[in-house]
Amino acid sequence: ASDVYKRQMCAATAGQRGRRVLVLDHAEKPGKKILISGGGRCNFTNIGAAPDRFLSSNPHFARSALARYTAADFLALVNSYGIAWHEKTLGQLFCDGSARQIVAMLLEEGAKGAVEVRCGGNIRAVTHNDGAFSVDLGGKTVTAGALVIATGGPSIPKMGATGVAYDRARQFGLKVVEPRPAPVS
């Protein structure tokens, strides 16, 4: 479900900085993966997250990303919304109530930045010409000066998860590190 967190936090931050933001989600409702994570209570962060626990061909990326927005930062946001939580094993934090609280918080953060969320669509193609990205939604095209693709991998196909992010990365010449199973800590 971390792809949903990343997407929503990226969108909220950009929107709150005055950017016009549109989130396209192929799911019928946002946060579908969050709602099933942690048995419906959402394992929303891990206070033991550290750069050396990430598999990457660029270990400095994890260090830089985690220094800019830490698990403590996200926990402070959760606390500011009055969401009760508890720690399970190895620093895993879960909602006392429901994962719906985290989804609502993320959507509210986006709303503070006037982020528009469109659900139920399917991105057919993405192109880049003359400094702009065009996203074909099957009959409608959205154009933007910047594009962030934040998707999960193909881990839960029955939820609609696909490898589309890998295809898009390759399309734009980005190096792809093939995913592999990893234990959750």
Predicted regions and their residues:
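Conserved Rossmann-like nucleotide-cofactor binding loop
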Residues: 6-7, 29
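Short, small-residue-biased leader/transition segments that mark boundaries at the very start
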Residues: 1-5
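Residue-level signal for inorganic ion chemistry
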Residues: 78, 106, 169
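Glycine-rich active-site loop/strand segments that organize a redox cofactor
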Residues: 41-89
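Predominantly flavin-linked oxidoreductase catalytic cores and closely associated redox partners
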Residues: 110-185
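An anion/pyrophosphate-binding glycine-rich loop and adjacent beta-alpha core
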Residues: 28-30, 35-36, 44-51, 84, ...
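Short beta-strand to alpha-helix junction loop
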Residues: 62-70, 89-108, 154-164
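Glycine-rich FAD pyrophosphate-binding loop
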Residues: 15-39
